[in-house]
């Protein structure tokens, strides 16, 4: 008799996706991040659901309701900190996942890559709106500054900003709609993840050598299920250490002050995972130019497949490209650091140099180096 998991319409889909899926025999731990991101999403949806049971999306009570969750709700503090730090782990895994894709040439699977970029934008939008909900000083001013950027759009900018605000400033209407969007978007992300996996399973995974692996596949279960469980264990241990020992390490102290439209914090800055983009935004003196650079800093990922000049897919055997890749990584770390610094000398100059280097590396330097490596293959 055939196993039910191979015949039942629903279980058959699960089986072909997570059990009998033929996977390359040599994928390394860098391929763990997909499952870790799935785990992060599940953690965020579950903790978020429990937070939403006690949260009130109203300017007068939002801050108090978050305090109430931490003080009065059973295990409320751990749910709140799991959700806040879970977002940090989510973005850490996202950046490593995208970096893996760039290093090993996974962007040649263009459909999967493009859905991934849409996912990245959606997750960033969700995280931004979630940061506004506690209605602390940084929540309010972050919302004001970031939504205000849309006013740089010619002709319709101001109308667009007021439409998003639901009034003439960030107020009750803004908070209510942000909560509504923050609640619904994770389910949109869930749907996009399914599309992401659908496209991935059309072609099969890439591998560290960047070569076809049809001739040497192994079943996903038990080999990669156990490997993913090991990665998940590391993720959960890291998350729990963060939550239980220093839950506010990655947060901003200003957000423990209730939102006050009459008092601007000395340094308005987003959470750490947006700092690199924020630094690029600030490095351009022109408002519209800054907004375009901000959007392009992520959207540039979409043109990476077109900039592929190398004859080898992966960077495994391309030492010069490897050096450029790690310079790009260092550059992003510098931008992250600069995004959290005040707008003064020498940080402004460092930010401008790092921003120019970021775009130059992706658009000019890395494709040129790849061409040079193609020549080296003939020597």
Curated annotation (Swiss-Prot):
Gene Ontology biological process terms in this record: mitochondrial electron transport, ubiquinol to cytochrome c
UniProt superkingdom: Eukaryota
Molecular functions per Gene Ontology: metal ion binding; ubiquinol-cytochrome-c reductase activity
Pfam family, one: Cytochrom_B_C
Consequence when changing residue 183 to Y: In strain: Isolate Jorg 33
Keywords, comma-separated and alphabetical: Electron transport, Heme, Iron, Membrane, Metal-binding, Mitochondrion, Mitochondrion inner membrane, Respiratory chain, Transmembrane, Transmembrane helix, Transport, Ubiquinone
Cofactor note: Binds 2 heme b groups non-covalently.
UniProt KW Cytoplasm keyword: no
Variant or mutagenesis effect after changing residue 158 to N: In strain: Isolate YLE357
Principal subcellular localization: mitochondrion
Binding positions (a ubiquinone): 201
Protein residues bound to heme b b562: 83, 182
Effect caused by changing residue 195 to I: In strain: Isolate RMR 44
GO cellular component: mitochondrial inner membrane; respiratory chain complex III
Protein topology in the membrane: Multi-pass membrane protein
Described purpose of this protein according to its UniProt entry: Component of the ubiquinol-cytochrome c reductase complex (complex III or cytochrome b-c1 complex) that is part of the mitochondrial respiratory chain. The b-c1 complex mediates electron transfer from ubiquinol to cytochrome c. Contributes to the generation of a proton gradient across the mitochondrial membrane that is then used for ATP synthesis.
PANTHER family listed in its UniProt record: CYTOCHROME B
Miscellaneous remark of the record: Heme 1 (or BL or b562) is low-potential and absorbs at about 562 nm, and heme 2 (or BH or b566) is high-potential and absorbs at about 566 nm.
SUBUNIT field: The cytochrome bc1 complex contains 11 subunits: 3 respiratory subunits (MT-CYB, CYC1 and UQCRFS1), 2 core proteins (UQCRC1 and UQCRC2) and 6 low-molecular weight proteins (UQCRH/QCR6, UQCRB/QCR7, UQCRQ/QCR8, UQCR10/QCR9, UQCR11/QCR10 and a cleavage product of UQCRFS1). This cytochrome bc1 complex then forms a dimer.
Protein's name according to its UniProt entry: Cytochrome b
Organism listed in the record: Microcebus murinus
């Amino acid at each position: 008799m055939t196993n039910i998991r191979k015949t039942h319409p629903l279980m058959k889909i699960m089986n072909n996706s997570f059990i009998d899926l033929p996977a390359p025999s040599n994928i390394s731990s860098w391929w763990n991040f997909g499952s870790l991101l799935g785990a992060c999403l599940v953690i965020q949806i579950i903790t978020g659901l429990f937070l939403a049971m006690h949260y009130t999306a109203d300017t007068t009570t939002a801050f108090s309701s978050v305090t109430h969750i931490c003080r009065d709700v059973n295990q409320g503090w751990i749910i709140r900190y799991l959700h806040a730090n879970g977002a940090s782990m989510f973005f850490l895994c996202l950046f490593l996942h995208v970096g893996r894709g760039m290093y090993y040439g996974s962007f040649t699977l263009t459909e999967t890559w493009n859905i991934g970029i849409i996912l990245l934008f959606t997750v960033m939008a969700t995280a931004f709106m979630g940061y506004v909900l506690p209605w602390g000083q940084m929540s309010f001013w972050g919302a004001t500054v970031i939504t205000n950027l849309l006013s740089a759009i010619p002709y319709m900018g101001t109308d667009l900003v007021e439409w998003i605000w639901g009034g003439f400033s960030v107020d009750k209407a803004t908070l209510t709609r942000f909560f509504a969007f923050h609640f619904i978007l994770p389910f949109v992300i869930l749907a996009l993840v399914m599309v992401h996996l659908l496209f991935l399973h059309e072609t099969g995974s890439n591998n560290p050598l960047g070569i076809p692996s049809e001739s040497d596949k192994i079943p996903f279960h038990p080999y990669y299920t156990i490997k993913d469980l090991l990665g998940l264990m590391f993720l959960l241990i890291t998350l729990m250490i963060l939550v239980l020992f220093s839950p506010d390490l990655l947060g901003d102290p200003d957000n423990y002050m209730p939102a006050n439209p009459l008092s601007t914090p000395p340094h308005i800055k987003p959470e750490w995972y947006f700092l690199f983009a924020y630094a690029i935004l600030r490095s351009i003196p022109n408002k519209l130019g800054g907004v375009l650079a901000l959007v392009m800093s992520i959207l540039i990922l979409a043109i990476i497949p077109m900039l592929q000049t190398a004859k080898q897919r992966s960077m495994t055997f391309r030492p010069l490209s490897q050096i450029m890749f790690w310079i790009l990584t260092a550059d992003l770390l510098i931008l992250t650091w600069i995004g959290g610094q005040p707008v003064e000398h020498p940080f402004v100059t460092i930010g401008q140099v790092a921003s120019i280097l970021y775009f130059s590396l992706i658009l000019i330097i890395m494709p040129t180096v790849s061409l040079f490596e193609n020549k080296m293959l003939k020597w």
